[in-house]
Swiss-Prot record:
TrmE-type G domain location: 224-383
Protein name: tRNA modification GTPase MnmE
Subunit details: Homodimer. Heterotetramer of two MnmE and two MnmG subunits.
Primary location class: cytoplasm
Residues annotated as binding (6S)-5-formyl-5,6,7,8-tetrahydrofolate: R23, E88, R127, K462
Length: 462
């Protein structure tokens, strides 16, 4: 285990609440807490068993004044998250109380932790690997149950296990090649022929491709579908956002141009996280503020994963509607014909023709009709029910996806070398590159600056 100084931070969100926690980790964690803690029985934290919790007060050692009433948990190395001694001081929530406790802890020998430093220590001390550490932040940021389950899988080491198995296969192959080259006289070692080498390389490539086949869905679960709502002014775009978000997030009026900017909201649609973006109605306008909103709407379209195009059932199609269809040509989209509670004036056959095979859903958002059908269309368009398979290991992290793609390329370079009749000792260069790239996923072969960058994304106290 690596030796570090003792760190401390508030590990609960700031603000009013029932309980706040100050966490300490390091060799001096128990000693520092012991200087500040007084129990009614006079017991000392240094003498208590590991994984126990104790009632008492935090005392300012200089003045002897009672600062807080607390419950203190003591957990001794190595059976802790960081594999160091860990103390958690549970005090009352709020801003003043928890900060008083933290300042006393820092004044008595602890250092304020950097973002993600507790998890970083868990990684550096061998408690978790890098992909498991990254899953911690995914778990915290998960917007749906499914996204949380994917993060939990990664935290449990399912991806790590597969990566280690692939690296072991490559390593055994490399070792076999080395023995053949360095000790050709060993008759009891099977010769690594091009055919045998190809079998090993094709197996690794197949497993990498299997992982990459989950990447599109995994990335959606991790980051959410960037879903842009577009349509002419006053067709019900903001009503759609409110209906999917199940709250009044956007202003809804009968005045065209009410939404003058881009409104974003995360929503959960049947387990699929949507980063729902309500745009200003796209139309020609003289209003400077509204025109800026329209320009931003057009920019958002270029970055969207899904377009929800809203039309008015009670009005004929306009040139603006047809122009919107042209703008989203070739994109994943669902056409929503809203206000079906009113008499039909829209040409539905023309709508279906313009939709070009993409789903068309009728809604009356005023009366909350058609929302279930819309949610089903969204889930079916991207997942088609396949997400329920619990035995899949999803790859959701962009860094992991990029490294898997690079490793696959290295394996394919090795296969091309075999086909070209290159010597086995040259082919192994590409295999070793694949082994190193896979190692970067779990942190076995990764630069320290990248580790610092990854953990800097965490919140304080985690």
């Amino acid at each position: 285990m690596t030796e570090f100084d003792t760190i401390a931070a508030i590990s609960t969100p700031m603000g009013e609440g029932a309980i706040a926690i100050v966490r300490l980790s390091g060799d001096q964690a128990v000693e520092i807490a012991d200087r500040l803690f007084r129990s009614p029985s006079g017991k000392r934290l240094k003498d208590v068993p590991s994984h126990t919790i104790h009632y008492g007060h935090i005392i300012d050692p200089k003045s002897g004044r009672v600062v807080e009433e607390v419950m203190v948990s003591v957990m001794r190395a190595p059976k802790t998250f960081t594999r160091e001694d860990v103390v958690e001081i549970n005090c009352h929530g709020g801003f003043v109380s928890v900060n008083r406790v933290l300042q006393l802890v820092l004044a008595n020998g602890a250092r304020l932790a950097e973002p993600g430093e507790f998890t970083k220590r868990a990684f550096l001390n061998g408690r978790i690997d890098l992909s498991q550490a990254e899953a911690v932040i995914d778990l915290i940021r998960a917007k749906t149950d499914r996204a949380m389950n994917v993060a939990l899988q990664q935290m449990e080491g399912r991806l790590s296990k597969l990566i280690r198995e692939l690296r072991q296969t490559i390593l055994e192959t490399l070792a076999h090649v080395e023995v053949n080259i360095d000790y050709p006289e060993y008759d009891d070692v099977e010769e690594m022929t091009p055919r045998l080498l190809r079998e090993k390389a094709e197996y690794v490539r197949g497993q990498i491709e299997k992982l990459l086949s989950t990447a599109a869905q995994g990335k959606i679960l991790r980051e959410g579908l960037a879903t842009v709502i577009i349509g002419r002014p006053n067709v019900g775009k903001s009503s759609l956002l409110n209906a999917l978000a199940h709250e009044n997030r956007a202003i809804v009026t009968d005045i065209p141009g009410t939404t003058r900017d881009v409104i974003e909201e995360y929503v959960n649609v049947r387990g699929v996280p949507l980063r729902l973006i309500d745009t200003a109605g796209i139309r020609e306008t003289e209003d400077v503020v509204e025109r800026i909103g329209v320009e931003r709407s057009q920019q958002m379209l270029k970055r969207a994963d899904l377009i929800l195009l809203v039309l008015n059932y009670h009005e004929p199609l306009t040139e603006e509607d047809e122009r919107l269809f042209a703008m989203i040509e070739g994109m994943d989209a669902i056409v929503i014909v809203n206000k079906t509670d009113l008499p039909r004036r829209i040409d539905m056959e023309r709508v279906k023709e313009l939709a070009a095979g993409r789903p068309v859903v009728g809604t009356s958002l005023l009366h909350e009709q058609g929302i279930d059908e819309l949610e089903k269309a969204i889930a079916d368009l991207f997942f088609g029910g396949e997400l329920e398979a619990g035995d899949l290991t999803y790859v959701s992290n962009s860094r992991h996806i990029a490294l898997l793609e690079q490793a696959k390329t290295a394996i394919e370079d090795a296969l091309a070398g075999i086909d070209a009749g290159m010597p086995v000792d040259l082919v192994q260069i590409d295999l070793r590159r694949a082994w190193e790239l896979l190692g970067e996923i779990i942190g076995d072969t990764v630069h320290e600056s990248l580790i610092d960058q990854l953990f800097a994304q965490f919140c304080l106290g985690k």
